Design a protein with these regions (language model features):
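Acidic, PIN/NYN-like endoribonuclease modules and their adjacent C-terminal/linker elements
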Residues: 103-161
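Active-site-proximal, substrate-binding regions of enzyme catalytic domains
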Residues: 1-92, 102-105, 136-137, 151-160
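Short beta-strand scaffold positions
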Residues: 96-97
Length: 161
């Protein structure tokens, strides 16, 4: 089971792979993350379109009310905090986020493995659903869509391949 926050869901939808992710994995998120997706979907840009794409699949992933302890800090917003709580409560295998700065704190809060969304591409390769070349191309598309080029998250993601 994977718990994914807003940023990870947007990234996966932005590279036209969200359908495949939903077929291969049991995806969960929080009500707060869905609210953030709804806010983002209001924008007429690539992130808004990706957020809308996630929302169009709302019936294919599980949304939980995880707002009872919704943790926030200078590095963790409400969506990330609620997803960390959710991952801990559900005993998720992974919490997926694209907020590299928040990774260590989310790891402590969630009590599970925390990774950036390109780990899902790596998992799809291991499952023989994507080949290396296709996954690498999706990573490059994510880097462009999410403005990751030359950033630490892009470097970390490339290390997966």
């Amino acid at each position: 089971m994977i718990v994914a926050d807003t940023s990870a869901l947007i990234t996966l939808a932005s590279i036209d792979i969200f359908d495949l992710v939903l077929e291969e994995f049991d995806i969960h998120t929080s009500v707060t993350a869905v609210e953030e997706l709804e806010d983002t979907a209001e924008y007429d840009d690539s992130h808004g379109k990706a957020a809308d794409g996630v929302l169009q699949h709302r019936d294919q992933f599980t949304v939980h009310d995880a707002s009872r302890t919704e943790f926030q800090s200078s590095r963790i917003d409400g969506g990330e905090g609620s997803c960390a709580d959710l991952a801990r409560d559900l005993g998720a295998d992974f919490l997926i986020t694209d907020d590299l700065r928040a990774l260590p704190e989310l790891q402590t809060l969630s009590g599970t493995q925390v990774a950036i969304s390109p780990i899902v591409l790596r998992a799809l390769v291991k499952r023989d659903v994507l080949d290396e070349e296709e996954a690498a191309a999706k990573l490059e598309a994510a880097a462009e869509n999410r403005d990751w080029l030359e950033s630490p998250i892009y470097t970390k993601a490339r290390d997966l391949f």
